[in-house]
From Swiss-Prot:
Belongs to the TRIM/RBCC family. Zn(2+) binds at C98, H101, C120, H126. The gene is Trim68. Residues 285-483 form the B30.2/SPRY domain. This is E3 ubiquitin-protein ligase TRIM68. GO terms for cellular component: nucleus; perinuclear region of cytoplasm. Pathway: Protein modification; protein ubiquitination. CDD domains: RING-HC_TRIM68_C-IV (cd16610), SPRY_PRY_C-I_1 (cd13733). It comes from the Eukaryota. A zinc finger (B box-type) spans 93-134. It comes from Mus musculus. The keyword Lipoprotein does not apply. Pfam families: PRY, SPRY, zf-B_box, zf-C3HC4_4. Functions as a ubiquitin E3 ligase. Acts as a coactivator of androgen receptor (AR) depending on its ubiquitin ligase activity. The lineage of its organism: Eukaryota, Metazoa, Chordata, Craniata, Vertebrata.
């Protein structure tokens, strides 16, 4: 076999399957595969690679216990020898003697970037060049190597951050895409059920559902392809970066004569290398969950919700008709009755809900912060509260002007294209359904809490939050809808 081909085959065997360069601190896992310790540890830290501390081999996907990583010292020794052998073959330095003059290689030609002997210095090829003793430039180039490595390692850190960020963003997008898919299915099913109960035709709703699902699948495929191309580009950059780092590290550890051969060309490549910033991809979902006609159907369950002033935090000002609330300039002198919230800017509705379907809308205007939903009647009103169904709250919130979130244990970010100025809330007590809609853009679906049995009577929940800026002074106002019961 050709020695070069044989060498290439050997190098492949001692490459890490993740970074595609020589194994560094190789560790073997229970399935028998071997990786760089840093590559494996870094991969398992990325979002989505481990769920509930369940890890898998990147190659065969066999389950692996992360604490069972075994250092492979014998393979590490083999890798070092292969590195040295490959370096010698690449540099073409079989001995320390000049092939032409049979003299020791003791000089370095800066222009030609190569080691020479004393006789070469006098030859026509080098007579006008700066040819200096190796010992005079050894430390200079070792220092340059370290500077170049420092630069590349900083770029490597940025590349790693980019890869982690990309993986996190892709994971968030996949979660949002799955939620949108579920929302479309559930909302159209809800609408079909309501139409059937009213003995109205469902064909148009079924056609709209199929069109929405097809649109979402097309969007999913297009975005997934863009993400994959971007991921491959990031990996290619990382691999080039890794190979340059490995090359310079190898040089820094070799005898001076071998270190200097071709060093300037390697330094030039590393010093000019910078991480390329890729064109950003929009991960904003374009396919809305909007059911035409649903709002008109929900309005048939409209109720006349009014605020209960006895529950309002002392800084909240409730209007005389009990239909709006805003954060007051000063604290009011109000009795600390058991119903009143002591710590938080919360006020509840006065009507308890223990059965049936109910719908109401709230004008939030251009406020930068608010909270809406329902809570159980017996929530703690004096101590710290946690806005989660686990603690009796089904609430969505706006924070910092653009951050829409649902009050669950995961506290997910809600991707809204159009900021809602009016929010619709639908509660189906028997179906354990509490859903929110953006009335501003035609009643697109905002969020539905996972089906969770209500533990008791419920009350509408309102929070205008603080008037921290000029965009948070508009009152929260309960809207009047036709057909209120």
């Amino acid at each position: 076999m050709d020695p070069a081909v044989l060498m290439e085959a050997i190098v492949e065997e001692v490459n890490c399957p993740i970074c595609m360069t020589f194994l560094r601190e190789p560790v073997s896992i229970s399935c028998g595969h071997t990786f760089c310790h840093s590559c494996l540890s870094g991969l398992w830290k990325l979002p989505g690679e481990s769920q509930n501390l369940s890890y898998t081999c990147p190659l065969c996907r066999a389950p692996v216990k992360p604490r069972k990583l075994r250092p492979n010292w014998q393979l590490a020794s083999v890798v070092d020898k292969v590195r040295l052998l490959g370096f010698c073959m690449e540099m073409g330095l079989k001995t320390d003697v000049c092939d032409l003059h049979k003299e020791q290689l003791t000089m370095f030609c800066k222009e030609d970037d190569m080691v020479t002997c004393e006789a070469c210095k006098q030859s026509p090829e080098h007579e006008a060049h700066s040819v200096v003793p190796i010992k005079d430039v050894a430390w200079e180039y070792k220092w340059k190597l370290q500077q170049a490595l420092e630069h590349l390692r900083k770029e490597q850190e940025e590349a790693w951050k980019l890869e982690v960020s990309e993986k996190e963003q892709a994971a968030i997008w996949k979660t949002q895409m799955e939620r949108r898919k579920q929302s479309i299915r559930w909302e159209f099913e809800k609408y079909r059920q309501l139409l059937k109960e009213k003995e109205l035709p469902c064909q148009q709703a079924e056609e709209e559902a199929a069109a929405a699902q097809a649109s979402l699948e097309q969007e999913k495929g297009e975005t997934a392809s863009k993400l994959e191309l971007r991921r491959e580009a990031i990996i290619r950059q990382s691999q080039v970066l890794w190979s340059m780092i490995v090359e310079l590290e190898e040089r820094s550890q070799r005898p001076v004569r071998w270190m200097l051969q071709g060093i300037q060309e390697a330094l030039n490549r590393s010093e000019s290398w910078t991480l390329q910033q890729l064109e950003p991809i929009s991960l904003e979902l374009k396919t809305d969950c909007r059911v035409l006609g649903l709002r008109e159907t929900l309005k048939t369950f409209a109720v006349d919700v009014r605020l209960d002033p006895d529950t309002a935090y002392s800084r909240l000002v409730v209007s005389k008709d009990r239909k709006s609330v805003h954060y007051g300039v000063t604290q009011q002198n109000l009795p600390d009755n058991p119903e009143r919230f002591y710590r938080y800017n919360i006020v509840l509705g006065s009507q308890c809900i223990s059965s049936g379907r109910h719908y109401w809308e709230v004008e939030v205007g251009d406020r930068s912060e608010w909270g809406l939903g329902v809570c159980v009647e017996n929530v703690d009103r004096k101590e710290v509260v946690y806005l989660s169904p686990r603690y009796g709250f089904w609430v969505i919130r706006l924070r910092k002007g653009t951050e829409y979130r649902a009050g669950t244990d995961e506290y997910p970010l809600l991707p809204l294209t159009v900021p809602p100025h009016r929010v619709g809330i639908f509660l189906d007590y028997e179906a354990h359904d509490i859903s929110f809609y953006n009335v501003t853009d035609g009643a697109s679906h905002i969020f539905t809490f996972p089906c969770y049995p209500f533990p008791g009577r419920l009350l509408p929940y309102f929070s205008p939050c603080y008037s921290i800026d000029t965009n948070n002074t508009t009152p929260l106002t309960i809207c009047t809808l036709g057909g209120e019961g």
